[in-house]
């Protein structure tokens, strides 16, 4: 249990929905910063594949518990919930990064390849949570094949 009174939480966040949205917002900012730092010295043409190295390291970390967005959104039925808005923003961020990276890599169809890499990422995270980090390594192998054409 948190050492905080419910009234204090509502005073700070306004509602339970805003508390959940604030949690996801923090998680997305942290993830973006981690990814950007990890890829900073990688040429844009190699970032899509290098991203999967980051995924493998994350899945192998002792703190790995899967994707906070997937966990949280799976519990929300309201499409307008503020946490869903945060989650959709993060998904759009990933999609745009993959489009940038696949374009820089010179693949034949960067948009379709970017969508496929998002699916691989989703599977890597969900699979690693259930089966262990080998699933992230499998996704990296598949990403390499996909990017090679």
Where are each of the predicted segments found?
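Helix-turn-helix
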Residues: 1-18
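Alpha-helical DNA-contacting segments of helix-turn-helix folds
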Residues: 13, 20-27
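Hydrophobic alpha-helical connector segments
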Residues: 22, 33-65, 114-117
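Amphipathic, non-transmembrane alpha-helical scaffold segments
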Residues: 24, 28, 84-92
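An amphipathic alpha-helix signature
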Residues: 32, 49, 92-99, 140, ...
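Amphipathic alpha-helical segments used for helix-helix packing
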Residues: 61-82
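Hydrophobic/aromatic-rich alpha-helical bundle segments in the mid-to-C-terminal region
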Residues: 82-89, 103-147
